[in-house]
């Protein structure tokens, strides 16, 4: 056992290529609340992320039960987009419970966030009886929507 305790989850972070576009999706489409948007001191960020010349703008958005950090790097040059698949080591995604998965898919499509396939019925696990779909945005960020089973 460690000599420290994890007190809570602070946030999940995604690096994005266009902070305005990502904020429009998370706030205007998904209904997140913008908590803060601001640049960070480049010297500080360079020390934190160990990338010489790093320069970023950060936004925090809040949904019920979870906060996201969205980071747009303005420097250094030569940045690239990750193209990982769910089967690749290091792949990450975030999952949100929704009350209507079809409406979530339609709203996401209107913002260019597309499903990887049709929603699927869950026949096992903690969400058995619900429905699930993976979506992907223009930056390759995967967002999973889960419609929990109806309460009887």
Predicted regions and their residues:
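Long, charged/polar, surface-exposed segments that mediate recognition or autoinhibition
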Residues: 82-87, 106
């Amino acid at each position: 056992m460690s000599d420290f305790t994890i007190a809570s989850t602070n946030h999940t972070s995604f690096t994005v290529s266009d902070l305005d576009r990502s904020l429009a999706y998370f706030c205007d489409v998904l209904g997140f609340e913008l908590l803060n948007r601001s640049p960070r001191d480049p010297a500080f960020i360079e020390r934190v992320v160990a990338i010489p010349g790093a320069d970023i703008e950060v936004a925090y958005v809040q949904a019920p039960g979870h906060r996201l950090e969205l980071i747009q790097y303005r420097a250094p040059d030569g940045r690239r987009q990750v193209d990982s698949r769910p089967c690749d080591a290091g792949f990450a995604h975030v999952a949100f419970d929704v009350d209507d998965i079809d409406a979530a898919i339609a709203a996401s499509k209107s913002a260019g966030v597309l499903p990887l396939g049709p929603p699927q019925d869950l026949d096992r696990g903690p969400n058995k009886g619900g429905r699930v779909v993976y979506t992907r945005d223009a930056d390759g960020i995967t967002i999973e929507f889960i419609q929990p089973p109806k309460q009887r």
